[in-house]
């Protein structure tokens, strides 16, 4: 019986084209090991021969980091094929890494502050219910320590800017989904960092749905002349109100927000070139405004101005756009789990971009799997646990947690099992701040993995549990 970690690792990296079947097998084994003991440092995951094998694979120049990434992207697209629509939130995040020599990576800020690391743009695949199902695409790169000052109003070609990384991620995700999930409509969700004319124009060329949060008060063409986006939206009719659940963060308590919603079709005036001085063209989108009616004292109100290629003439259609945009929070949660929560990729001590990218890709998929279990237990807790866990893993949880009235061999739901796993990881109940998070679930899974290995050994040896 294959445990869920090995089954997951095989489905994620089993088709990686690394030039040798033994390398692919090693990648699968490495991913399974990381899933059992996630950590940013190779030395904290593996020992002895396994550690040496992991380093050989990561540092082998014949093993392209792009092939490891592409395998993860294909696995994500295959998972997305189960849905008619998949949300694809995209976000950029900085990865701060220890680099005492200052020669391995680049600056985190565009202003040289001396802090080194890498940049990443990630496209996460999320089910209509809000459950992460895979990695759509990801770009990881270093900035240059020698940033050239640009003349006033001068803009380099898009290909020489970080916007190209966003465009590459959008393209890779859309093309991979188109090839492996042709019946699934990708609905990209971009925060204000994606509100750039080259990105909007590229999204319009792709056969996808998109929503982008407006970052500027763009000019809009009307029948009577030119007005600002804020003016045109402010004059549009209200469609209704919507109750929005706002999740807790480090800086924000969870709350339920009542937001008023209005929308209208607008013709954005956008430059054809990079100078911003013209010539111009008109770019037709739907603009939607969601404004919180009464926010708690001290809380930043929800106030979104969104640009989408979806038609919004009813409150039901507006609801779909707003729900889709809330999936932006999923990619932020993923980045947190990847960087410092479940996986701690920022603790990595690898010293080459290629080796780091391979390791980071494996840890990214592990973080998504942890987020998948977390959200699945909240959205569809009644799902049979056997859909996500092996029989030996379920029995290991029962043996460790000892739930009242439940014995080895009993059935359980995903909701039950994830809560039991969280208990094993030290969860103290909702009084701790809410349902179990990814860090506590991951801690419990580590203990379950060791117990499940013992259960498997006993079963294969015909021992009694």
Give a label for each model feature.
Residues 1-104, 112-119, 125-465:
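Single, function-defining residue in the core of a domain
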């Amino acid at each position: 019986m294959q445990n869920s970690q090995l089954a997951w690792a095989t489905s994620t990296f089993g088709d990686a084209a690394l030039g040798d079947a033994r390398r692919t097998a090693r990648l699968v084994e490495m991913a399974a090991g990381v899933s059992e003991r996630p950590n940013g440092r190779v030395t904290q995951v593996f020992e002895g021969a396994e550690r040496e094998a992991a380093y050989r694979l990561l540092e082998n120049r014949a093993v392209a980091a792009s092939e490891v990434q592409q395998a993860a992207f294909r696995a994500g697209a295959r998972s997305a094929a189960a849905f008619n629509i998949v949300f694809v939130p995209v976000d950029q995040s900085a990865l701060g890494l220890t680099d005492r020599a200052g020669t391995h990576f680049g600056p985190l800020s565009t202003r040289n502050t001396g802090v080194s690391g890498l940049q990443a743009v990630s496209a996460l695949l999320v089910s209509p219910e809000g459950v992460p199902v895979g990695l759509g695409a990801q770009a990881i790169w270093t900035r240059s320590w020698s940033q050239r000052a640009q003349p006033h109003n001068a803009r380099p070609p898009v290909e020489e800017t970080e916007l190209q990384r966003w465009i590459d991620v959008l393209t890779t995700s859309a093309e991979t989904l188109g090839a492996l999930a042709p019946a699934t409509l990708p609905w990209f969700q971009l925060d204000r960092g994606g509100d750039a004319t080259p990105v909007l124009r590229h999204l319009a060329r792709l056969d996808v749905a998109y929503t982008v949060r407006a970052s500027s008060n763009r000019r809009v063409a009307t029948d009577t002349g030119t007005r600002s986006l804020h003016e045109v939206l402010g004059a549009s009719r209200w469609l209704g109100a919507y109750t929005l659940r706002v999740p807790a963060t480090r800086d924000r308590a969870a709350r339920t927000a009542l937001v008023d919603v209005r929308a209208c079709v607008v013709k954005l005036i956008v430059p054809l070139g990079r100078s911003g001085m013209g010539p111009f063209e008109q770019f037709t989108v739907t603009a939607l405004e969601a404004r919180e009616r009464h926010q708690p004292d001290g809380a930043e109100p929800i106030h979104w101005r969104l640009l989408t290629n979806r038609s919004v003439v009813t409150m039901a259609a507006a609801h779909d756009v707003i729900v889709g945009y809330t999936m932006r929070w999923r990619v932020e949660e993923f980045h947190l789990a990847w960087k410092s929560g479940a996986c701690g990729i920022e603790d990595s001590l690898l010293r080459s971009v290629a080796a780091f990218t391979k390791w980071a890709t494996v840890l990214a998929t592990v973080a998504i799997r942890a987020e998948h279990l977390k959200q699945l237990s909240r959205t569809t807790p009644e799902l049979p646990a056997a859909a996500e866990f092996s029989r030996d893993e379920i029995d290991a949880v029962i043996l460790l947690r000892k739930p009242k009235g439940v014995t080895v061999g009993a059935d359980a739901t995903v909701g039950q099992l994830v809560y039991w796993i969280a208990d094993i990881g030290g969860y103290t109940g909702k009084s701790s701040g809410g349902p179990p998070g990814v860090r506590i679930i991951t801690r419990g899974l580590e203990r379950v993995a060791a117990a499940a290995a013992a259960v498997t050994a006993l079963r294969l040896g015909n021992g009694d549990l």
